[in-house]
Amino acid sequence: QYHDFTLDVRLRRPRIHPGRALSTPSFFIDIDGVLYGGSAPVAKGPGVLAYLRGRGFPFLLVTNTSRMSANDIQEKLAGLGYQVNSDEILPVSLAAAEYLTHKFDAARCFLIGDDSLARLLEKHGHTVSRKEESADAVVIGQSLWADFGEIDIARRLALQGAEVIALHRDATWPDGDVTRIGLGPIVAAIESVIDGAVTVIGKPQ
């Protein structure tokens, strides 16, 4: 069951600072299951975003997917009738890359995740490895499969001081007509064998 859009227009107008196009977004809007379900947009979805834009309420579309770039998502939404710009979309993979830049400048990362996440991290100046070698961070992103060997490497690197960063901790994620195990069980497994906390980047955190 997908969210039905309702609006309360008694909202505070965003503050616009001199020299800046937008202030903090008035709305943070999820994408999958909110703007579309499967291959179809939700009823009134495109109209709601057009309404917000017309009323001067800036919004940011947020998603826990780490397998699509902002441009990929923008193209998908355009095909569903949504008129949005790529800079109005924040995938969790981009948020993670920016977090690593803020924390480490150029981080050495051990990655549990797919190649699209590896490419994005490298594009932002980080080094990505799937081997057990010195690392600043263990990054856990979406992957069809993760094995105990990777979790064991992550454990040892964490014990050596690497920060463990998970893109989210959703228990499952939709993949067409089925659901698959998400990052939540992987994060829980790593948490059970390390002393420190896992940094979670995505929503709702």
Regions found by a protein language model. Give the residues of each.
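Cationic, low-complexity basic patches in intrinsically disordered or flexible, solvent-exposed regions
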Residues: 2
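HAD-like aspartate-dependent phosphatase fold
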Residues: 5, 11, 16-31, 35-205
